[in-house]
Each structure stands twice: as structure tokens, then as C-alpha cells.
Amino acid sequence: MPLLTGVALALVAVFGWQGWQKYQANQSHGASLVYQQLLEAALEPSGQPDVGKVSELANTLKNDFAGSHYAQYGSLFVAKVAVEAGKLDDAAAELQSIVDQPADDSLAELARQRLARVLAAQDKADAALKLLDGKVEPAFAASREELKGDLLVQLGRADDAHAAYEKAKAALSEDAAVGGLQMKLDDLAKGDA
């Protein structure tokens, strides 16, 4: 009898695992299809995204595939469309939702930097700067420091901005393009910032 119970439990485990794997694959495929539709709505050939459709599809991703990468990429597009429409509060809310519960560290940092730019556009550079405090992965160090420099320039803190731009430059690999960053440093040196 224990042998039959063991075999039955093993079969249940195997078939349960296979069922779970199939469910996960179907969920991923479904999210991928909705995300593809969102991309098509956001990147209309006319240059004008279908705002209503983008919002509807992003809500579908959030509701049906919550916490997935696709749902958060959808939120990034909603934020982009909101910025283009001048709805900075809506963009900030979308980005904040990713920062609060990111699907992974890369999405968290991407959303954090975009949110900082939105806050800066709302004349909230201090809040944006505070958002960028803390540890950062080396892959994002240069872009975060450059953004800090931009925010510090906006706040009129040229010396601190120069230091941030230097940190950004130091964080770049030797073969990275530093043209734009060097122009910002040169502008600060001339006092044009």
C-alpha cells in the first residue's frame, strides 16, 4: 500500500508540475500578445499614439498579468504617452508604481530615472534628486550620475553638478561615447550652466 501511495504522489507531482509549466507558458504568451498590441497602439505610423487603446491595453496587462515584466513595460509606455500629452502627474503615478514594486532591479532603476526626469519637469528637482539617493548597479551608475548632474544644474548647484558629471564620466567604460557628457562639463567650466 505505501508503494502505491508513493507512486500516486509521484504521478500527481509530475503532472501537477507539467500543468503548472503549461499554465505559465500560456500566461506568458497571453501577456506577450497584449503587449504587442500595446506597442502597435503606442507606435502608430502617424506618430500619434492611440492614447485610449494604450491605456486600455496597459490596464489589461496590469489586471490580468499583474507584476509581470510585460505589465511594467506597459506602464513605461503609458508614462511615455502621458509625458507626450503633457500629463506629468499621470506619468509620475505610472512610474512610481514600478518603483514601488519592480519586477526586477533593472526595471526599478529605469523607472526611477524616468520618474526623476518627470519630477524635474514638474520643478521638483529636490524630490527627483532624493529619489536617486542610494545604491545603484554599476551598469546604471553613469546614467544616474549624469541625471544627478542635470538636476543639480537645475537647482543652481554648479560645483555639485560638475562632481556628478565627473562621477558619470568615470563610471563609463573607456570606449563609451562621452561627447554629450563632456559638453555638459565644458559648459559648467565656462559658467554657462
Region roles according to the model:
Residues S28-S46:
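Short extracytoplasmic/periplasmic juxtamembrane "stem" segments immediately C-terminal to an N-terminal membrane anchor
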Residues A42-V51, N59, H69-S143:
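Alpha-helical adaptor scaffolds
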Residues E84, A121, Q154, D187-G191:
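Register position in tetratricopeptide repeats
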Residues E137, G156-A176:
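TPR/TPR-like (Sel1-like) alpha-helical repeat modules
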Residues P2-Y23:
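Single-pass alpha-helical transmembrane signal-anchor segments
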Residues A177-A193:
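Extracytoplasmic/luminal low-complexity segments enriched in Pro/Gly and acidic/polar residues
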